[in-house]
Each structure stands twice: as C-alpha cells, then as structure tokens.
Amino acid sequence: PRLSAASFSARRRSSACQMECGILAGFFFTVWSVMSQPLDLNELAHKIKQWGAELGFQKVGITDTDLSASEPKLQAWLDKQYHGEMEWMARHGMMRARPHELLPGTLRVISVRMNYLPANAAFARTLKDPSLGYVSRYALGRDYHKLLRNRLKKLGETIQQHCVSLNFRPFVDSAPILERPIAEKAGLGWTGKHSLILSRDAGSFFFLGELLIDLPLPVDGPVEEGCCRCVACRTISPTGAIVEPYTVDARRCISYLTIELEGAIPEEFRPLIGNRIYGCDDCQLICPWNRYSQLADEEDFSPRKALHAPPLIELFAWSEAWFLKVTEGSAIRRI
C-alpha cells in the first residue's frame, strides 16, 4: 500500500531520530569505555611523547611542579635589579616558581622543545660585515608563540581523548612561569652558563613550551650538566652581560638593550652593540655544544629576505608602512 505524505514524513523523522540516538549512544559508550578503563599512566606518558613528536616537537619531557629550589636564585636576581625595566618579571613574585598557582590542581608539567635554527643562517658573514644588520636568528621567521601554543593545545586535546576529565593549559612565554628550570627538570637539557638550556644533541637553538596538566604522570629525570670548565659564553659577551656563571644582568645584555629597553641605550654600550639591530646570539654561537644544533623542520621559521642580513643603509629608508609589512606576524613587532 502507498504511504501518505504525512506517514512518509513521520517515518523519516523516526528514522532520523533513531540515527541521532544511535550516534549519541555511540558517543556516550565511547566516553564510558574510556572512563571505565583503568588508566595506565606509564603507557600514557609514552604516548604523549609520541604524539608530541608527531606534532613537531623534537623533545618532550615530564616533570612535577616543585620549583622551590629555583626561588632563592630568582629572588636574588630580582633583588639585584638584573631584570632592568622588565617590571613584569617582579610583578608576580614567586608565582613563577609555582605552576599550580596558574592552574589549580596542576600535578605535572609537560615541557617541549622545537628547533628554530634556519639552514642558511649565515651567522659569521653577517656579524663580520659592518654594512649589514644582524637580527637574532629566532626572529627571522614567523612569531613562534602562536605556532607552539596551537601545537600544545592539540597535544592537550589528544590527551583529553584518553582522559576526558583532564584539565590542561598551554604556555609559550604567555604567563609567569620558569620555563628553563622546568625544562631542566624534565630532562630536555641542562642550564648553561649563559642561562639557556643546552642539549647534547641539539645545542640551544630551540624554543620551549609548557603544558600544565592535572594527571600524576611518571616524571623524567634531569640530564648531566656538560659545561664543565668552559667559560666561552662569558668571554664572548660584548657587554659583559654574563656577570657570573648562570647569571645574566639583563641591563647589559644586547638582547635586552635592543628589544626590551624602552628608553635610549646607554652610551657605554652603543659601540659594543656593533651591527646587532635586534637581539644577540653571541653566547650561543661560541658554545661548543651548538656544533650539534639541529635545523628547524618548520617552514614558518624560514628567514624572511628583508630581515636576513639587511643592508643597514637601506633600513634608514624604511617607512613605517614598509616596516609593518615586513614584520607582519613576526616577533619583531613587539618592539
């Protein structure tokens, strides 16, 4: 028998309803299955490192939130005014050493590394030619903050698929947190005498990021320190910014003077800056461990032609409009 239009429409609605209910049932069954299965934290930690590698991180480590050992040094550094005009360094006090205050309930911090060294860096040629401007290698490509943060967010969402109750928060220079002590505790490397993290297989030309989570994952241990008696970074600093091993006086650092300092650069430092117009890499370039630096995998970190060894005489002719165009999406926009 033929169906009336009303009957046919009713059957279609019934079929659609059954399909929707089936989808919802499947979803809730999946959630129930995930929640009902005992969580193997060791296996999950292993998978997190695999997922991190798939997302473009060259190294992933896990550590707890106890950074109390770093608090006295941080306070002493602030007391000596080594942070200069970076008042935001002191604004949050010891919160930098207490990740659990940023995300209540935090039990672990996942620390990640992403290489940024471009293949055609041409360090020496640019620095030795006084007619060319030197831009710190990390700033030659697109701003790393958004890229790393998005990847960390994806990592958190992937973990959440296996632990639906997970709370997480990604950080890439976006909150008061001691990323280097975290990276050191997580086994990504050790703190060099220039205060940067060094890795035996990657040197120091890499970015760091953190993912705070509330899972009691097994933690990784620190690696052995490898600087020994080497003081090359202290010796090479044009302005004597590394005032003692592992301690940088930002007020003397060329990176601070050319990026962070809002006023005029003190006269005593001007001739020492040379052709470095944005940042400085000298303490990294001289480091023996950077013979093992790894090149960046990300196309976004490729140097922009206008920023890669620009003739200084041409920079004087840049208009504001051209500057904004050339630095669009670049970390240089922060100055």
Report residues per predicted region.
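Alpha-helical scaffold domains
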Residues: 265-335
